[in-house]
Amino acid sequence: FSGTGSRDDVGIKALDEHTLQVELIQPTAYFLNLVSFFTYMPCREDMASTGEGWERDPAKCITNGAFYLEEYKIGSHVLLKKNENFWNKDNVKLAGIKGLFITDATTSLQGYEAGEINVTSTLPGEEIPRLLAEDPNFVSEPALGTTYIEFNMDAEIVNDVNVRKALSLAIDRKLICDQVLRNGAVPAAAFVAPAFKLSTGESMRTMDEYGNVTTEFEINPNSAEVDKAREYLAAAGYPNGEGLPTITYLYNEGTGHQQIGEALQQMWGQLGATVTLESQEWATFLNTRKAGDYSIARNGWVADYNDPICFLDMWVTNSGNNDVQFGKGAAADAKIYSIDLTPYGYDTKVENGTWAETYDV
C-alpha cells in the first residue's frame, strides 16, 4: 500500500491463464468470502474504459461468473442468464435470475405471496412472525449485521462514559426486537453480530445453551437494567435525571426507525431524561452524522465477509465510517488509551497513547 515493496514480496502469481495462486501469511477462514466480494472480481479493462454505464450494457458487461447480464432496465429489473462457459456450470441449477428493483416493503410482500418473488430482503417486519408460522416454505436467514445507536464522542453530555452507560443499560433490547421490529432480529449485547462464525461453525459471540446471546460488557440482552443505569447517571452528576440537558435522538426516514426512537424515548424517560426525536432525509442524515453534527443517532452495519474486522475497522481514526468521531477533533491528541497485544504474539504495547497510537494499530 505504501509503494515501498517489491514484486517478490507479494505472494500472488498467475500459474497459467486460468489459475491464480495466493500465498497467505496465516490461515484465513474468511478468504474465499473475501475474494468473492465484488471488488475482487476480474474486470475487462477495455470494456470498463468505454465510458459511464458500461456495467449496465449486456454487450460490454463481460463476466466470468455463473451468470451473465442479459438485460438491465433502470428502475425495473436486471435479468441474468446461466453462463455455459462457467467452470462449474454443471452445479448451477438455475437457468437465470431476475432481480426486481423494489424498495417498498409492502410491494415486496405482495410479490412474494403472489409467487412472483422467491428471495427478498425487504418485508414489513410485522408480517414476518405470521409468515414463519403459516408458510412452510418461508425461511428467514440471519444477516452479518447489527442495528445500533451511536454516540458522538465529541458531543456535550454523551462524551461522559457514565451517561453513555446509563443510556445503554436503560434499553430493553428484547422488547424492541419482539414488540417493535418483529422481524426476527435478536438482541445484541455487543457490536459484532452473533451471525459471525468461527471455522468450526460456532458463533464468535458467547451463546447460551438455547442459542441466545449472553450478557457481555454489563449488557443484559434480554432486559433493561434500569436501577444500574440510574447509578451511572447519578455518578455523572445527574441523580434521577436532574440537570440532564435535553437529549436529541437522530434517525433517518424509513420503516421502523421512528418506532424505535419512540421506544427509546420512553425507556430513557424512566431515568428522568427528556428526549426529542429528529428525522432527516437519508442523504442529509448521512452528511449530518459524518460531520459529527449530532449527539445520538441510529446506525446499522452489514459486513462484507465473515470476519469481525469488517465491523472493527470502522473505528480507526481516518475511516470514512468513523461517525462517532473517535480520535477526531478535540480528542485527537488525548493520550488516555492503552493497548497490549504482546500476549497474542505481537510487539504492540502502548500506555497512555492517543486513539491513533492504540486502536489504529
Residue spans for each PLM region:
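Extracytoplasmic/peripheral linker and loop segments enriched in polar/acidic and small residues
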Residues: 1-8, 12-13, 215-222, 274-285, ...
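Short helices/loops that flank or line small-molecule/ion binding pockets
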Residues: 106-116, 130-133, 161-162, 262-271, ...
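Short helix-loop capping/hinge motifs at secondary-structure junctions, enriched
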Residues: 86-89, 155-163
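A local structural motif
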Residues: 22, 89-100, 241-248, 266-280
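Append "and occasionally in soluble cytosolic enzymes with long acidic Gly/Pro-rich linkers
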Residues: 82, 159-266, 270, 335, ...
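Ligand-binding "clamshell"
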Residues: 128-140, 292-293, 307-325
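Extracellular/periplasmic solute-recognition and catalytic clefts
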Residues: 70-81, 98-155, 174, 178-180, ...
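Gly/Pro-rich hinge or "lid" segments in bacterial periplasmic/extracellular proteins
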Residues: 2-9, 13-19, 24-96, 106, ...
